[in-house]
Swiss-Prot record:
<dbReference type="InterPro" id="IPR035979">
    <property type="entry name" value="RBD_domain_sf"/>
</dbReference>
<dbReference type="InterPro" id="IPR000504">
    <property type="entry name" value="RRM_dom"/>
</dbReference>
<protein>
    <recommendedName>
        <fullName>Polyadenylate-binding protein 2</fullName>
    </recommendedName>
</protein>
<dbReference type="InterPro" id="IPR012677">
    <property type="entry name" value="Nucleotide-bd_a/b_plait_sf"/>
</dbReference>
<feature type="region of interest" description="Disordered">
    <location>
        <begin position="1"/>
        <end position="43"/>
    </location>
</feature>
<dbReference type="Pfam" id="PF00076">
    <property type="entry name" value="RRM_1"/>
</dbReference>
<keyword id="KW-0539">Nucleus</keyword>
<dbReference type="GO" id="GO:0003723">
    <property type="term" value="F:RNA binding"/>
</dbReference>
<dbReference type="GO" id="GO:0005634">
    <property type="term" value="C:nucleus"/>
</dbReference>
<keyword id="KW-0694">RNA-binding</keyword>
<dbReference type="GO" id="GO:0005737">
    <property type="term" value="C:cytoplasm"/>
</dbReference>
<feature type="domain" description="RRM">
    <location>
        <begin position="101"/>
        <end position="178"/>
    </location>
</feature>
<comment type="function">
    <text>Involved in the 3'-end formation of mRNA precursors (pre-mRNA) by the addition of a poly(A) tail of 200-250 nt to the upstream cleavage product.</text>
</comment>
<dbReference type="GO" id="GO:0008143">
    <property type="term" value="F:poly(A) binding"/>
</dbReference>
<feature type="compositionally biased region" description="Basic and acidic residues">
    <location>
        <begin position="10"/>
        <end position="24"/>
    </location>
</feature>
<keyword id="KW-0507">mRNA processing</keyword>
<dbReference type="GO" id="GO:0031124">
    <property type="term" value="P:mRNA 3'-end processing"/>
</dbReference>
């Protein structure tokens, strides 16, 4: 359309004005969307990252628990056949029966090797497994180990080596005791079950609970 007074094209100007306004609105809308996206995405990514970290941590804890349940130490247990101490290395017998023919050896020199310990205890009887305890964080030896014999009779001979010197350190040897749940180590049982409170004399769990009045004391060398 043409203006008769000045000869300008009014319709074209109106169309250009509308197009300009649309472009401005689109620019503002795109800008707002960009701001929203840039504001939301980092937060969403951070949440996803934390969730993945939590999943990894839960997986590691599950693996650690499974290892502890399948093997007493989870590391450095070596059988005479050369098997490293994992769940498959243990014989398919009751854990308490295995412990009944094993001894705990404390104050062991940190540099002592499996072969040295084996040679030291071979005179007591046939050794089935030696488990050197290590720190789960550093992997360094704790200065103690378990020696498992084939026969229970070997325990008597091994106990005779208590206070003997091995690699210039005086060994402390005691019969190995089966690991007890936490609440049993504290001398109490969950509600509804009998506790370890007793009168005088020695308690009834393999001589491990000494009486007295009130709460019994549960001795564990390891």
């Amino acid at each position: 359309m043409t203006d008769n007074n000045n000869g300008e094209i009014v319709e074209d100007k109106d169309n250009e004005k509308l197009k300009g306004e649309d472009n401005i609105n689109n620019h503002i809308s795109n800008h707002n969307n960009t701001e929203e996206t840039s504001f939301e995405d980092p937060e969403l990514e951070e949440m996803k990252k934390r969730f993945r970290e939590m999943e990894e941590e839960a997986k590691k804890l599950t693996e650690l628990q499974n290892n502890l349940e399948s093997n007493i130490t989870g590391n450095n247990g070596v059988g005479i056949g050369g098997n490293i101490g994992g769940g498959g290395g243990l014989m398919n017998t009751d854990q308490e029966e295995i412990d009944s023919r094993s001894v705990y050896v404390g104050n062991v020199d940190y540099k002592s090797t499996h072969d040295q310990i084996l040679a030291y205890f071979q005179s007591c009887g046939t050794v089935n497994r030696i488990t050197i305890l290590s720190d789960k964080t550093t992997g360094h030896p704790k200065g103690c180990c378990y020696v498992e014999f084939v026969n229970k009779e070997s325990i008597i001979n091994a106990m005779a080596l208590n206070d003997s010197f091995f690699n210039e350190r005086q060994l402390k040897i005691t019969p190995k005791r089966t690991n007890l749940p936490y609440y049993m180590r504290q001398g109490v049982l969950p509600p509804g079950r009998g506790g370890f409170r007793g009168g005088r004399g020695r308690g009834g769990i393999r001589g491990g609970i000494r009486g007295g009045r009130g709460r019994g004391n549960f001795y564990q060398p390891y």
